[in-house]
Amino acid sequence: RKLEKDRKEVWCYTGLFGSMMKKLVKREFHSRSKFFACLLTFCAGFVDAYTFMERGGTLVAGQTGNVVFLSVELIHHKTGEIEVKLATMLAFMLGIFLITVLRPIFEQSLWRVTSISPLVLICTLVGSMPNTVPNMFIVPPIAFCMGVVATAFGEVDGIAYNNSFMTGNLKKTMVAFGTYVRTKKIPYLEEGLFFVALLASFVTGAIVSTYLIQFWYLRTIWLVSLILLAFLIFRLTQYLRRR
């Protein structure tokens, strides 16, 4: 009897755990969740470090950095990568413009999720190309996809954030914490912690990318493809099951 009772308790706890996990997955594993925001920010830091180290010192997400690098190169007459940086900035802007024009379409959950598929494809192709391929054909296409993703995913629970560069997120972190200190309202503390998580995700992505480049070289970017493809398949599977 005692053994049977223990088994029932085990099954009870197992069922409870399973129910909690289902609720967690349903709540957090979607395209406008804080989890996915951190995942995208991790990928942005990862890709920025990758292109900076392996593709001519150009950033695909941090366009402020590209402006600074471009200015320095102009002054020192280092014109080798100027065209790449200009094309990268224009491609990023074009990605933002395109999603802004098509915003009514991408407000739908399914279309919004599929907007990461070009980034998955480009990262897969880039990892397959040798370093003899000019950076002009590598970096701007990635920047375009980053502009698309940055615009398609920019809000979580009414909180506007940026998954591509950190200056705005740094400001919002301090504003949220400062407002919490002044008002003692918990939502501001939670918002500040969310932005801390975003900052940590970006830094972690850059560190992981820098480390893995030592071993995987140009193929390092495949990790971004793998992460985003797994999430894309997961979300599409959820969508099909609900139909």
What feature does the model see in each segment?
Residues 97-108, 213:
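Helix-to-loop junctions at the C-terminal end of transmembrane segments
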Residues 12-31:
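Short, Lys/Arg-rich, polar N-terminal cytosolic tail immediately upstream
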Residues 109-113, 210-226:
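A membrane-interface helix-boundary motif in multi-pass transporters
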Residues 121-133:
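C-terminal ends and interior cores of transmembrane alpha-helices
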Residues 62-79:
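Perimembrane loop-to-helix junctions flanking transmembrane segments
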Residues 42, 47, 135-162:
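Hydrophobic core of transmembrane alpha-helices in multi-pass small-molecule transporters
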Residues 93-97, 199, 203:
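Hydrophobic/small/kink-forming positions within alpha-helical transmembrane segments
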Residues 109-118, 138-141, 162-165:
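Cytoplasmic-side transmembrane-helix entry/capping segments in multi-pass membrane proteins
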